[in-house]
Amino acid sequence: AVHLCDVGAGAGFPSLPLKIMNPQMKITILEPLNKRVVFLKEVCREIQLDNVECLNVRAEDYAKEHRESFDLVTARAVANLRVLSELCLPLVKKNGIFVAMKGAAGFEEQAEAEKATKILGAELEKAEEVHLQDGSARVNLTYRKVRTTPPQYPRAYAKIKKSPL
């Protein structure tokens, strides 16, 4: 079964809808805000979703012991892609996929993050603009992990934020 990690899941998007559509999928949610973790655990209990682990932890801390252990990592509305890629790509298995769900500025972020994603071992596989019913644009960036992430990444969050790759 596919093992998905959702970084900064917030209210559970996209991980919970993906789990509902793919019941065999194993989900690990990393969420630094405990009140969101409590909410997500309650939602999973209420709608009887099994094989969903909701953890109150930061991605860069979790990655220390769970490097390259996920087939698919998703993130939506977490951080700028230069920061986000360092939080997420160390978690992705070699040949796995990282999907960054970005706003309308996604293409600009992708260009700015090109060096970072390369250093971290990923190549852009697809950049897709989608339009919501209200007319607003979103950009989904899909990366394939082609090389192992160098062991010094991810750095501490303060370092990532202060000097993104």
Regions found by a protein language model. Give the residues of each.
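Conserved SAM/SAH cofactor-binding pocket of Class I
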Residues: A1-A79, S85-E86
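Residue-level signal for inorganic ion chemistry
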Residues: L18, K102, Y143
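Helix-to-beta-strand junctions that scaffold the AdoMet/dcAdoMet cofactor pocket
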Residues: N22, V92-K94
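Short alpha-helix immediately C-terminal to the canonical SAM-binding loop
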Residues: R36-V38, G106, Q110
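Short "lid" loop at the C-terminus of a central beta-strand within the Rossmann-like core
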Residues: E60, G103-F107, H131
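Short glycine-/small-residue-rich Rossmann-like dinucleotide-binding loops
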Residues: A77-V78, G103, R147
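Conserved beta-strand signature within the Rossmann-like core of class I S-adenosyl-L-methionine
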Residues: N95-A105
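SAM/dcSAM-binding transferase cores
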Residues: A111-L165
